[in-house]
């Protein structure tokens, strides 16, 4: 479905691998989130039990039965602006997975309660981005084998969509 949507729109999709640094360039994500000067690298991807992870963080709010945790390094090569993290997305071949903003803040205390971040030029910052995987949005068989489901971390949406292919086995 995501590929169909992309095919009827006039933009290209570029795929990257985990461990590869993706320079966003003049691309955008979200309506106002220009990312020129920023880059992303996915260092680790894991799918964990939601209850166990939330217990470690003493979090009692709503969360997915499972969580997709994307460990990234964010780098600023020369922008004076910041970026909104909540515009980043996790997609599959036919599904979008929502970010858990509460867990984002608990997993990254350095954000100090903000879902945006501004790095000084030349700086890097490591983050864990948590996404809720809710069984009701997947078929029973797909959810049972969610570790085999193809996920992509989208770091830019247009004019060029930039997707990092995620793997549990890297």
Where are these regions (language model features)?
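Conserved functional micro-motifs across diverse proteins
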Residues: 1-69, 75-170
